[in-house]
């Protein structure tokens, strides 16, 4: 389905970078033979205060919120030897990459383009372009494809990430 298309799109957009080489849970091979020692060591190295952020929103009581954060996270110790990530740079994409993904879900299509990361001015432009194309109401995709029922569903959105971003167009045929 579309989730598999997106995953494979990322492996094509980012063949060197963890965005395309790693999945959230890991590969089937990783999950077949997990080493408890390796899992614990990974957790101790990376799941540390100097490698995390706590995001809150809404009508919060600051004193109560700080108390809860201290209660649940105050005992965590930073890793003073946390390695600096030196992530690989991607080569330019010079030709289309086409992949066919087989699975049990209905047919779908996804097109994806790589862009600079969130801090880039290009990402701001990408967000504007995205809204012109698809915003759930009056974007070009909304008006010309979805509302006219030429497809079962179609969409377009930017995926903003730190090192690179992606723009994804996709849809489900009728």
Question: Model segments located where?
Answer:
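An aromatic/glycine/proline-enriched structural segment found at the starts
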Residues: 16, 53-117
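Sec-exported extracytoplasmic/periplasmic mature domains
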Residues: 14, 18, 36, 40, ...
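Short, solvent-exposed loop/turn segments at the edges of secondary structure
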Residues: 47-50, 92-94, 103-108, 123-124, ...
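Short beta-strand/turn micro-motifs at beta-sheet edges
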Residues: 40-43, 96-100, 153-159
């Amino acid at each position: 389905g579309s989730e598999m298309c997106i995953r494979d799109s990322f492996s094509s957009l980012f063949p060197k970078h963890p965005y395309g080489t790693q999945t959230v849970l890991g590969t089937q091979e990783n999950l077949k033979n997990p080493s408890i020692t390796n899992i614990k060591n990974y957790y101790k190295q990376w799941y540390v205060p100097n490698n995390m952020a706590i995001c809150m929103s809404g009508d919060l009581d600051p004193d109560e919120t700080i108390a809860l954060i201290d209660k649940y996270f105050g005992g965590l110790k930073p890793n003073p030897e946390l390695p600096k990530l030196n992530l690989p740079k991607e080569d330019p994409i010079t030709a289309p990459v086409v992949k066919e993904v087989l699975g049990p879900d209905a047919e779908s299509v996804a097109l994806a383009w790589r862009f600079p990361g969130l801090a880039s001015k290009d990402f701001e432009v990408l967000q504007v372009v995205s809204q012109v194309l698809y915003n759930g109401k009056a974007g070009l995709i909304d008006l010309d494809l979805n509302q006219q029922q030429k497809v079962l569903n179609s969409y377009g959105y930017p995926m903003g990430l730190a090192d690179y971003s992606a723009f994804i167009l996709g849809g489900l045929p009728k």
